[in-house]
């Protein structure tokens, strides 16, 4: 985290000073959130894990419910609608969905440890959960969160004992779905191009990549 904050400061201080006359404004803002995040992590770690097991399906249902709300009342930014803004707080429901996937997967696996080699308990419930979340994220659209959650689900299934034959099939299916996503969402092609050739659009799509390169170079 410390290294990330230092890299952020190195990449943002010039632009921050140009816009706000305070070179550390972006750094300080992120530092505050980092400290708050550590506090939340500590509080969560103090909660008995049995509580998460009992509330796992409720957490998952709440996260899916929030994702359903995004297309209707979400805040649009950069051509995508990913945030919910309730005035006193704004957040991306996809972050809660990640937590919901972890809790629900762990609870199901703990209850059916001996049946993880079967389709019914080793594949079906997880594919249904990931499928619902992936479709809702597709509507936003939110490619990065989709990939993270799918990868997270795959890792949990692997650790949980899902048969490798099913895992290979899911990887193939996942690659096909990602290909379809890239073909149907035009903005992703622009982002890939900006990643490969950031100098072609240094003030917009290529800005973050170039600033990261400046940070590494300095």
Show the residue positions of the predicted features.
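N-terminal signal-anchor transmembrane alpha helix
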Residues: 1-7, 176
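Hydrophobic alpha-helical segments of polytopic membrane proteins
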Residues: 57-60, 64, 120-136, 143-183
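Hydrophobic, glycine- and aromatic-enriched re-entrant/interface helices and adjoining loop segments
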Residues: 77-83, 166-218
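Hydrophobic residues in alpha-helical segments
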Residues: 109, 113, 138-139, 157-159, ...
């Amino acid at each position: 985290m410390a290294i990330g904050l230092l890299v952020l400061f190195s990449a943002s201080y010039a632009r921050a000073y140009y816009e706000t006359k305070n070179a550390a404004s972006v750094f300080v803002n992120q530092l505050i959130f980092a400290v708050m995040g550590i506090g939340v992590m500590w509080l969560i770690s103090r909660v008995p894990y049995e509580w998460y097991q009992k509330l796992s399906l409720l957490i998952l249902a709440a996260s899916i419910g929030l994702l359903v709300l995004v297309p209707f009342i979400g805040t649009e930014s950069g051509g995508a609608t990913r945030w919910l803004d309730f005035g006193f707080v704004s957040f991306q429901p996809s972050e809660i969905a990640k937590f919901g996937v972890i809790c629900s997967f762990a609870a199901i696996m703990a209850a059916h440890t001996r049946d993880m080699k079967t389709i019914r308990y080793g594949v079906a419930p997880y594919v249904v959960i990931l499928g619902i979340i992936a479709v809702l994220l597709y509507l936003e659209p939110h490619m990065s969160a989709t990939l993270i959650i799918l990868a997270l689900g795959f890792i949990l299934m692997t650790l949980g004992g899902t048969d490798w034959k099913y895992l290979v099939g899911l990887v193939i299916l996942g690659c096909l779905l990602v290909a379809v996503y890239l073909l149907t969402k035009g903005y992703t092609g622009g982002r890939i191009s900006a990643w490969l050739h950031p100098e072609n659009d240094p003030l917009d799509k290529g800005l973050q990549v170039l600033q990261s390169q400046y940070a590494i170079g300095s």
